[in-house]
Amino acid sequence: MWMPDGIHMEKYRPKIHFSAKDFVINDPNGLVYYDGEYHLFHQYNINEQIYWGHAVSTDLVHWKRLPNAIAPDEIGQIWSGSAVVDEENHRMAAFFTYSEHVTGRQSQGAAFSYDKGRTWEKYEKNPILTDERPDFRDPKVFR
């Protein structure tokens, strides 16, 4: 059962560990504290399309699921990465892996949010890093 306050009440579902109401989540990433909220991003597999899911908390126990942060596009699926607070530009910055639809090749992309992570704009020149080698994923950026 899914409760309106966002806490799952199923017998075998974790009570504190964040979990999705439906579909499959994995790879928590981009954990960041910004303007009074902890942000948890994760891979969110919705019918074989990989997004960055998003949840926020003020206490790391009670989580509120937000709309997906970053959606797949014509370049590819959105895989793991990291997020940082860009204080100079008053925004959050996310760096993620693209898994290209046709070739499966991996590259890195970026997106930015100016409203506490509620909406995201992908960098217009994505992908920002490419490489022909396999397993070119999971960028880690920190400040």
Give the residues covered by each predicted segment.
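Beta-rich carbohydrate-recognition and catalytic domains
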Residues: 1-143
